[in-house]
C-alpha cells in the first residue's frame, strides 16, 4: 500500500508540473470517462495446468487531464474492470491432480492509477488519430475456484504491480468543448501473488496469474 501511495504521489506530481506549464500556455484542462469491452490473454492454471480463456469484461476509467501543447495532452486516470474471469473446464495434467476433471475460474480484482500521454498523429477536419502510452501502479488480486477438487479454492491478497498501457485511437468533436473517442488499448497489469494451499498433506502452488488485456473503449472528454 505504501508503494502504491508513493507511485500515486509521483504520478500526481508529474501531472501537476504539466498542469502548471499548461496554465502558463493558457490551455484548457478536461475530465474524461471511458468504458468498453476487454478480453484477457489466454493463460494456464498453475495447480492443474488447465489452459484458461477469458470472458468479456468491462473496463471503466475516470480521469482528469490537460492539453499541454496543441497536439499533446496528458491525464491521470483511475481504472478498474467489471466481471472479468479466466476460466475453463478440462482434465488436469499436473500432479497430484493428473486425470481429474475440473472446472477452474480465476476472477481478478484490478485497480490501476495511470499517468498517460497522447500525441495527435493526424488532424483531419472531422476527426483526429492519436497514439498514447501510460504507466502507473495497479493493485491486483484474485479469487480462485476449483470445482471438482475439494479444498483447493482460495483468495490471494493484493499485490502492487507496475501497469503499462499502449493506445491507438481516434477522436472527434461532437459539441463545443466535448470530444468523443474510440480507442484500442493493450494493458499489462502484472501477476497476482502466489499462494501455497495444503491439499491432503501436499503443498500446492496456486495463484501467480498474469493479467494482460486487449481493450476496445468509447469515451468522452469534457473541457472544464
From Swiss-Prot:
Gene3D superfamilies: 2.40.160.20. This is Putative adhesin A1C_06425. The keyword Signal applies. GO terms for cellular component: cell outer membrane. It comes from the Bacteria. It comes from Rickettsia akari (strain Hartford). InterPro entries: OMP/PagP_b-brl, OmpA-like_TM_dom. SUPFAM superfamilies: OMPA-like. Keywords: Signal. Residues 1-22 form the signal peptide.
